[in-house]
Amino acid sequence: MKNLILTLLISCTFSLYVVAQKTKNVQYLAEYTFNVKPGTKKINMSCLIPQHIDNIQHVDTLIYNIPPNRVYKQNGDRMVEFVIDSIEGNFVLEIYANLKVISNDSSNKKPQAISKNQSVYLVAEKYLESDQDAIIQQAALLKKNSELKTVQSIYNFVRKSLKYSGYNPKDVGALQALEAGHGDCTEFADLFVALCRASDIPAKVIEGYMIGYNVAMSKHNWAEVYIPELGWRVVDPTSTSFNRLENAYVKLTSNRTNPAIQNFHYYAYKYWGDPIEVLESIKTKVVD
């Protein structure tokens, strides 16, 4: 999987190693099982779906077993909406995609100025409380003499200060993660991004899937951070390596909250009539 190690000399005293890997062909299957009752009249389902992102991933095929009412973009996300009003019992909604996941290789990146619309990645928001005193004070302690060194300092701090406590369906945010000292991948990403923003370094939380895991492990949050020499770079605060990331991420969104899915993760639904149950299964695998 790892074909060569590319060394980028950022300065005479610091080097950043990134692993150049082959593009991976990935099959993605999302299955949503709807368990309904006789009195269920209508269901509205909205989902995040993979999209083409330069130097990150290409979507070659996208197939639905139930025709969607609309596929649209909102705040940079690709969304699909289903309105189901002819319900004759339990059913399964399938979303199938073929993707090419591109190497996390800084040689693919070209430095560019931060744009006005990207300045939102410098401000505090819900779950990313970069304006709170505890976050600001900790960020000041981690500050180094370059953005790259500061980012690595923040990464090291998050790795050492947070204990991975297993999946928690409740979002608590960066501030509570810092105070509690534990969390899942969401809290790791939230704290990393909040500390970067408090250091005046643009950063964002990424939500998506890890390739080749079952649903319990597949959902994942990581981060992207803007480094002037490299542009936007992927950083996974739960990874044991800052420099060498496996080419194993399917990106869905860089919005920490999304009103289109009621600020939930991945999908949201509404129903009319009797209540329903929705069971989710996500499968990703690498194919030749």
Q: What is the predicted function of each stretch?
A:
Residues 97-183, 191, 198, 258, ...:
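Secondary-structure boundary elements
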Residues 16-20:
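Sec/Tat signal peptide C-region and signal peptidase I cleavage site
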Residues 7-15:
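Bacterial N-terminal signal peptides
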Residues 188-266:
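Hydrophobic/aromatic-rich core segments of domains that either
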Residues 45, 154, 180, 247-248, ...:
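Extracytoplasmic/lumenal soluble domains of exported proteins with redox or metal-associated functions
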Residues 21-103:
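Intrinsically disordered, low-complexity N-terminal segments that are enriched in acidic
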Residues 1-4:
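Positively charged n-region of N-terminal signal peptides that target proteins for export
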Residues 61-64, 109-118, 237-240:
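Short intrinsically disordered coil segments
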